[in-house]
């Protein structure tokens, strides 16, 4: 039960932060200047303004295991780059610490997610059949 509570708390916080990226689409002066300061093109702001909220929705919906893997990976890459950008840009720990906290919550959400929200691994027999079909098991 505790694992389920930890999962939902971390996931809701992560999803809320990802949904907040909708502000990237408004052309908010603070967001635009932040992307400019980092040297990133404004088109990245638009892409993230669409991708992050989409990831939030996928994380909250049941099923969609493969899309969830992509959502977790995309959020990790985006926040990893944000962490590096803020740290190397001279922003203080108040700024990059928040991004680091979101990355930790993302990992907690990923690790504690229920089996119904995980990608089912390929069975070994399928992998063996694929190797045989591709000819990698053939003897010289």
Where in this protein do the model-derived segments appear?
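Membrane-interface extramembranous regions
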Residues: 1-140
């Amino acid at each position: 039960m505790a694992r389920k509570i930890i999962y939902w708390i971390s996931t809701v916080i992560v999803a809320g932060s990802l949904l907040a990226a909708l502000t990237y689409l408004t052309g908010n002066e603070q967001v635009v200047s932040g992307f400019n300061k980092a040297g990133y093109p404004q088109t990245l702001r638009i892409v993230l303004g669409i991708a992050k909220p989409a990831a939030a929705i996928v994380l909250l919906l049941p099923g969609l295991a493969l899309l969830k893997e992509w959502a977790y990976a995309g959020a990790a890459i985006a926040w990893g780059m944000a962490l590096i950008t803020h740290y190397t840009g001279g922003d203080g720990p108040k700024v990059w610490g928040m991004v680091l906290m979101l990355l930790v919550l993302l990992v907690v959400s990923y690790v504690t997610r229920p089996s119904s929200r995980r990608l089912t691994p390929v069975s070994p027999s399928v992998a063996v059949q694929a190797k045989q079909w591709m000819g990698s098991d053939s003897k010289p």
